[in-house]
């Protein structure tokens, strides 16, 4: 049976940290499913379709991975995909408490599903989509945070939002 891992997230927008984690996960697992979360209660700057499209462009050339979206309970999605592992990024100690709580909740919901935490490269430890959106809204250059096309989409979306 193929070793599949699920990497869930909102990816609003996709960052160099996300791309780094995807690339490294494909070196460990036979197939990585990047699962874009559609969360009706969570407000995102980009639509689900836009987030998927940005991920497709950003991950071109990375083998053994696919991009899908899902809505609902993560453990149910993982089961449907016949996976037993999900991977989560831990940037800083501040991420740990939330991710630990989620991992334990998921384990309680399905003890067969494991959560693996991966650290990003040191140069990406501070990156978060939320921080990048904030910095972008103040007009900063984002070349160290996101790909050029993501920066352009981000600035366009923020300009539309501010009008």
Region spans (language model):
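Nucleotidyltransferase catalytic core that binds NTPs
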Residues: 1-163
């Amino acid at each position: 049976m193929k070793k599949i891992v699920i990497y869930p997230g909102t990816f609003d927008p996709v960052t160099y940290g996300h791309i780094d984690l995807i690339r490294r996960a494909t070196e460990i697992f036979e197939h990585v499913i990047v699962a874009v979360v559609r969360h009706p209660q969570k407000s995102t700057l980009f639509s689900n379709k836009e987030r998927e499209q940005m991920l497709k462009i950003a991950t071109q050339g990375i083998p053994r991975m696919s991009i899908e979206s899902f809505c609902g309970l993560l453990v149910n999605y993982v089961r449907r995909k016949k996976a037993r592992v999900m991977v989560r990024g831990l940037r800083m100690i501040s991420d740990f408490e939330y991710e630990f709580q989620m991992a334990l909740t998921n384990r309680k919901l399905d003890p067969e599903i494991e959560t693996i935490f991966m650290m990003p490269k040191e140069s990406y430890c501070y990156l978060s989509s939320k921080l990048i959106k904030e910095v972008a809204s103040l007009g900063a250059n984002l070349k160290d945070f996101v790909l050029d096309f993501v920066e352009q989409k981000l600035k366009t979306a923020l300009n539309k939002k501010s009008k």
